From Swiss-Prot:
It comes from Oryza sativa subsp. japonica. Expressed in roots and seedlings. The lineage of its organism: Eukaryota, Viridiplantae, Streptophyta, Embryophyta, Tracheophyta. Keywords: Auxin signaling pathway, Nucleus, Repressor, Transcription, Transcription regulation. It is found in: Nucleus. It comes from the Eukaryota. Residues 21-34 have a biased composition (Low complexity). Aux/IAA proteins are short-lived transcriptional factors that function as repressors of early auxin response genes at low auxin concentrations. Belongs to the Aux/IAA family. The gene is IAA27. PANTHER family: AUXIN-RESPONSIVE PROTEIN IAA17, AUXIN-RESPONSIVE PROTEIN IAA27. This is Auxin-responsive protein IAA27. Coiled coil: none annotated. InterPro entries: AUX/IAA_dom (IPR033389), AUX_IAA (IPR003311), PB1-like (IPR053793).
Length: 351
């Protein structure tokens, strides 16, 4: 006996409802996937990298922009998967751009592979590496254009050697060469204080050295002796009324006015007798009481002044000549003639 199996057929409305729900769910999933792929492709286009891990992202169809210079070139489309594929630039006459298709990366790769250079040797024109290469190429071209002529001069190796200066020593840090230069200048300008110059009169020490030549002091240089004589010797001319011949005395050999007056007073007794500096104490009383003559000096302005009015150092600095004149008003006569005194002090007018 045959058993009849009944096949239940779902109602038409229920089947269509079930089919519609399944198809709508599939459509929604497909739409979500497409939106995600489109967003990823847009992000890839903006960043120039692929963010899909493993390179397994959906295909992003992009048309590559093409430019042709100098001829009828035609652009071609580029299909990319994973990595972004940029446009192809065709340069030339009658050239045509070809289709570029980049294969997607193998599964299981890291997303950092997007930062590695493309296997096809492509580089994004706006990337940092591309700009660096462009700048290097421009610099190289400009350097080639600025090359000097073929005549090249070669410097010897010895000339290129840098001479090292001595190290700075002390504080402030000054090089040794400059310190030696300053020391040399100071030694030249420093006066010789060890050499003491004495007056022109003979002394006991000089006589002892003259007697024993073996122990005589070393001679000084001529320049040092001349400089010392200029500072310690100051000779001035002495004129006396009634004598056409003058005398010279060393003013530096005297320390004050009294010593100078004694020498000049001795000249009044015997003008041509040489002045004996060793016997200055002889006849001091007679010299002090004598007022028959007066002593004048001529300063640097040419005026005649009375000896003893200014300090001794100022007198040595300004005295050029000495005059022995007769006293217009001696004590023994007791008369004073100011007119004659003024006439004697006035310089004679040239004829």
């Amino acid at each position: 006996m045959m058993n009849l199996i009944s096949f239940e057929t779902p109602p038409l409305g229920r089947r269509s409802q079930d089919g519609g729900s399944s198809s709508s769910s599939i459509t929604a999933a497909t739409t979500t996937t497409n939106k995600a792929k489109e967003a990823a492709s847009h992000l890839d286009l903006s960043l120039g990298i692929s963010l899909s891990p493993g390179g397994g992202g959906g295909d992003a169809g992009t048309k590559a922009s093409s430019c042709c210079y100098g001829g009828g070139g035609d652009g071609g489309g580029c299909m990319g998967s994973g990595m972004l594929t940029a446009g192809v630039l065709g340069v030339g006459h009658g050239g045509s751009s070809h289709d570029n298709t980049t294969a997607s990366s193998g599964g299981g790769g890291s997303w950092t592979a997007a930062f590695m250079p493309s296997p096809t040797g492509f580089m994004h024109p706006w990337s940092l590496a591309a700009r660096q290469q462009k700048a290097a190429a421009e610099q190289e071209r400009s350097g080639v254009a600025r090359l000097p002529p073929a005549t090249t001069t070669y410097m010897p190796r010895a000339a290129a050697t840098v001479i090292s200066l001595p190290a700075a020593v002390g504080w402030p840090p000054v090089h040794t060469s400059r310190r030696n230069l300053v020391a040399t200048i100071n030694n030249v300008l420093k006066p010789d204080t060890t050499a003491a110059v004495k007056p022109d009169r003979p002394t006991q020490a000089t006589a002892m050295f003259a007697a024993d030549e073996t122990t005589a002091p070393p001679p000084r240089s001529a320049a040092a002796a001349t400089e010392a004589s200029r500072t310690l010797n100051m000779f001035a001319k002495v004129h006396m009324d009634g004598y056409k011949v003058g005398r010279k005395i060393n003013l530096r050999a005297h320390r004050n006015y009294d010593s100078l007056r004694r020498v000049l007073t001795k000249m009044t007794h015997n003008f041509f007798c040489p002045a004996d500096y060793s016997s200055t104490n002889k006849g001091e009383e007679d010299c002090a009481k004598s007022d028959e003559f007066i002593f004048l000096y001529e300063d640097f302005e040419g005026d005649r002044m009375l000896v003893g009015d200014v300090p001794w150092e100022l007198f040595l600095a300004s005295a050029k000549r000495l005059y022995i004149a007769k006293n217009p008003a001696p004590r023994n006569k007791g008369t004073y003639r100011p007119l004659v005194w003024i006439c004697m002090l006035l310089p004679k007018a040239p004829y």
